[in-house]
């Protein structure tokens, strides 16, 4: 499941950034049942059923298990937060592809260390992957979400910009975060069973029937 042990500070050693390749479905499915590391936090976008852990270190492993804080030294208490994740063609709910469907005004919740934040989407647009100026630090009130605009290799990225809802009480934001996270978790569990486990079971049953048929010949 996509709920991690949440750290309370940055790790002393951050992995060296790796060249990131398009994700393979088998690697993502393997990672989804083998989550055994701590995360910096969790991002929840309820309108598109996205709930993913936030890791530090731009590596293939971290990107297969969730999302990555692109600039880990930028704490959302004093800086803009930038989160990047993969777009998976087979099912956008697996990782971060669902953010391309976020509409203006949509809610986004973030847990980062022990703090909770609520944001409202202000824009959702396509940029070139080289447009790093779009990710400039604008202070603590902004959140950037990034994914590829397709599941194949592409020079373009989806960039969602959201603004912090500063007037919401912390306890209300925390309660909303956990409520939406739990709802998405239940939905993802059902989706996983229907899309992956059920077809596998059908294949196994058909294989068994075929073997029995061959054995009786």
What role is predicted for each listed range?
Residues 1-216:
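Solvent-exposed, non-transmembrane regions of membrane-associated and secreted proteins
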């Amino acid at each position: 499941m996509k709920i991690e042990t949440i750290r309370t500070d940055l790790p002393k050693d951050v992995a060296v950034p790796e060249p990131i390749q398009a994700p393979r479905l088998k690697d993502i499915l393997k990672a989804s049942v083998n989550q055994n590391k701590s995360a910096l936090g969790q991002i929840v976008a309820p309108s598109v059923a996205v709930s993913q852990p936030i890791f530090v270190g731009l590596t293939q492993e971290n990107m297969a298990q969730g999302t990555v804080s692109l600039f880990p030294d930028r704490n959302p208490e004093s800086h803009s937060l930038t989160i990047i994740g993969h777009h998976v063609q087979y099912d956008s709910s697996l990782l971060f592809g669902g953010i391309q469907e976020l509409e203006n005004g949509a809610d986004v919740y973030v847990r980062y260390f022990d703090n909770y934040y609520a944001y409202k989407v202000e824009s959702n647009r396509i940029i070139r992957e080289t447009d790093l100026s779009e990710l400039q630090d604008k202070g603590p009130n902004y959140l950037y979400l990034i994914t590829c605009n397709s599941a194949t290799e592409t020079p373009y990225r989806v960039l969602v910009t959201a603004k912090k809802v500063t007037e919401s009480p912390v306890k209300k934001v925390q309660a909303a975060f956990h409520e939406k996270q739990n709802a998405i978790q239940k939905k993802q569990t059902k989706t996983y069973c229907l899309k992956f486990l059920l077809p596998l079971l059908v294949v196994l049953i058909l294989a068994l029937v075929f073997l029995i048929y061959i054995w009786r010949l």
